[in-house]
C-alpha cells in the first residue's frame, strides 16, 4: 500500500503503483483541507454570485447561469456529455496510475470535492475496479476531459470497468466490489474531469520504461564495444570531467565498470592500428548520458505535475474560488517531447552499433552478418534491417507535439497542449526501442563469442549468459522473430541489465 501525501508523492511510489499494481490511498492528514474546500464550494452553491462550474455552464457556455435546483444534474450531465473517448482502452496499469494521480490532485484541498469522492476512488483502487477508458480524444486542455469523464462515469454508475477479470457496466463493477455509485455535488464532476492526470500517467509510464531502456543501453553497448574490440580510452574519467555533464560522467563510469577485466580488451590494448573508433562506439557516454540527463529533466517536471492541483476553478487558501489555467498540460507536453527525443536518440545510436557489427568492413574481423557460414546463411542481415525500420519510426514519432495547437470549444479554449497523444506515443516508442536494443544484444553476444578463446569481463559474461538462456547462439539460419521478441522482453523487464550485477544509474 502506498500512502500518498499530497504535494510529496515520489516517483518511486508512482512507479510501484504503475509497475507492481500497488494499492494507494491518501494520507489521513489530507482530509481537513479537502473538507474545508468542499464546505466553501457548498456555500458558493447556496449563494447567488456566479462561480464557474458550480452554478454556471462550461467552456463557451460559462456565462449561462444554472438554477440551484439543477446543480446536481449539471454535474451529471457534464460527465455524460464528456464521455467522447474513442480508440483502444488505456492499459489497466496506466489507468490505475491516472486514478492515483487524481487522488493526489484532489488531496491538495483546492478542488472542493467531498471526502466521499476521495474514498470512492480509493475503494476502486483497493478493489481493482479499473474504468475502461478510450485512449483517444484529449487535446490536453482544458485538462484531459474525455478520458477522465470515462473514469468519473464509473463513479456515478455509468460507463464500464474491469474487475475480477471481467468487463462490466459501471454500476455492476462497483457492486461486484461492494461499492456504491456517488451522486455528485456542486463542482465535483468538473473536479474529476478537469486535470492532466491522463497525460501525466502516460508520460510517467514512458519515463519509467525509458529509464529502464537507458540502463539496458549502457550494458548492451558495453558488450558491443567488446564485440568489435573497441577502445576503452574514450571512457577515461578525465575526459568526462572536463565536460561536466552528470549523465555523461555516470554513463562512462558505468561502462568502465562493465568492461573492467575483459580479456578481449586487454588483447588489443597495445599494437592496435586503429586510432579512433566510430562515433557510435566512441561517443556512447556523450549520447546515452545526454539522454539520461534529458530523462531526468522530464522526471522533475512530471514529479511536480503529479503532485499538482490541476483543477479549475481552484479553492484558494483564503477561501476564494478563482478561475485559472492549471489544467493546461503544456508542462506535460514538453516533458513527453523530451522523453521522445531521448528514446529516439538511444535507439538511433544503438542501431548504428548493430549496423557496425554486421558489416565486415567495420567490425574488425567479425564474419559478415555475424554468421559462421556467410553466403549459405544470411545470419543477422534482416534483423539489422528491422532495427533500421524501427529506428525510423521512432525518429518520426519524436517530432514535437506541443507545437501543434488548435482552437476548440468555439475558440474559448484557443490554445491546447496536445500532451495526451504526445505522452501516449511513448509506449510505442519504447516497444520499438526494446527491439532495437534486444537485437543489439543478440549481435553483441554473437560477436563476443566469435572472439573466443578470449573472454569478455565477468559482468558482461553474466549478461551474455542471461541472454543465452532465452536466445540460443545463431549457427544455421532460423526464424529470428521469436529471438528478437525474447531479447526485447529481457530489455523491458530489466533482466538483462540486472544480470551484470553492478549498480546502474538511478532516475
UniProtKB/Swiss-Prot annotation:
Alphabetical list of Pfam families matching this protein: Lyase_aromatic (PF00221)
Which residues fall in a coiled-coil region?
none
What organism is recorded for this protein?
Answer: Cereibacter sphaeroides (strain KD131 / KCTC 12085) (Rhodobacter sphaeroides)
Provide the protein name. Answer: Histidine ammonia-lyase
Tell me which residues bear 2,3-didehydroalanine (Ser). Answer: 142
| Catalytic activities | L-histidine = trans-urocanate + NH4(+)
State the PROSITE patterns in the record: PAL_HISTIDASE
Pathway assignment: Amino-acid degradation; L-histidine degradation into L-glutamate; N-formimidoyl-L-glutamate from L-histidine: step 1/3
- Top-level EC class: lyase
Q: Which GO terms describe its molecular function?
A: histidine ammonia-lyase activity
**What InterPro entries does the annotation carry?**
Aromatic_Lyase, Fumarase/histidase_N, HutH, L-Aspartase-like, Phe/His_NH3-lyase_AS
Q: Where is the protein situated, by its record's location annotation? A: Cytoplasm
The biological processes this protein is annotated with in GO are: L-histidine catabolic process to glutamate and formamide; L-histidine catabolic process to glutamate and formate
Q: Which post-translational modifications are recorded for this protein? A: Contains an active site 4-methylidene-imidazol-5-one (MIO), which is formed autocatalytically by cyclization and dehydration of residues Ala-Ser-Gly.
What UniProt keywords are attached to this protein's entry?
Answer: Cytoplasm, Histidine metabolism, Lyase
Q: What is its EC number?
A: 4.3.1.3
Similarity comment text for this entry:
Belongs to the PAL/histidase family.
Gene Ontology cellular-component annotations: cytoplasm
Identify the CDD domains for this entry.
Answer: PAL-HAL (cd00332)
Major localization listed first in the record, in broad terms:
cytoplasm
Instruction: List residues of cross-link (5-imidazolinone (Ala-Gly)).
Output: 141-143
